[in-house]
Swiss-Prot record:
Similarity comment: family membership: Belongs to the universal ribosomal protein uS4 family.
Matching HAMAP family: Ribosomal_uS4_B
PROSITE patterns according to UniProt: RIBOSOMAL_S4, S4
Protein name: Small ribosomal subunit protein uS4
Gene giving rise to this polypeptide: rpsD
Assigned GO CC terms: small ribosomal subunit
Organism name: Xylella fastidiosa (strain M12)
UniProt KW Glycoprotein keyword: no
């Protein structure tokens, strides 16, 4: 499956937002002008978009945050719409339960792309078995751990150091950094998830 491998700043400028594609220790610098679109002479972002444009931009932003392509994202929406409860919240929960995202939330990788690579390289176990599919959905109660080989990766050590420095902790995961493992305790509530995502716009887009 194709993945974007270009500059993360370009994507951030396209969406006008920090997509968490860089390590917290390497925040977007002054060269990444979020108010301007990509390109040598990117036009300053317009203050007002049409309803459709706003819905489309929100979908693109969320896709890029979680590293999901269009077809897969649409399938997530279809799945979310068949579940009980709020479709938008269901969609975010499906994205949050992806294995690469769980690895990122637990602090074993500084970005989701780094977490995806860790999973793809067979460095992650779920309930004692290696899982190399980033889109694998983790369930409440699952134990996620790094393989002995992955525990020695410098990028993992650096990520855990950054996690400790920034104090990033999420209530729906419990992590034992010394054992390089964690428990996915429960599905996150909407209040626990990023407030800068407006999932209602995505629901409106796909409901047309």
């Amino acid at each position: 499956m194709a993945r974007y491998i270009g500059p993360s700043c370009k994507l951030a400028r396209r969406e006008g937002a920090d997509l968490s594609l860089k390590s917290p220790s390497r925040a977007l610098d002054s060269k990444c002008k979020l108010e301007q679109r990509p390109g040598q002479h990117g036009a300053v972002r317009k203050s007002k978009l049409s309803d459709y444009a706003s819905q489309l931009r929100e979908k693109q932003k969320v896709k890029r945050i979680y590293g999901v392509l269009e077809r897969q994202f649409r399938n997530y929406y279809k799945n979310a719409s068949t579940k009980k409860g709020n479709t938008g919240e269901n969609l975010l929960q499906l994205l949050e339960t992806r294995l690469d995202n769980v690895i990122y939330r637990m602090g074993f990788a500084v970005t989701r792309p780094a977490a995806r690579q860790l999973v793809s390289h067979r460095g992650v176990l779920v309930n004692g078995k290696i899982v190399n599919l980033p889109s694998y959905h983790v369930k409440p109660g699952d134990i996620v751990a790094l393989s002995q080989r992955a525990q020695k990766y410098l990028c993992v050590q650096e990520s855990l150091t950054i996690k400790d420095q920034h104090g990033s902790a999420f209530s729906w995961v419990e992590v034992d950094s010394e054992k390089f493992s964690g428990v996915f305790k429960a599905l996150p509530d909407r209040a626990d998830l990023p407030s800068d995502i407006n999932e209602a716009l995505i629901v409106e887009l796909y409901s047309k």
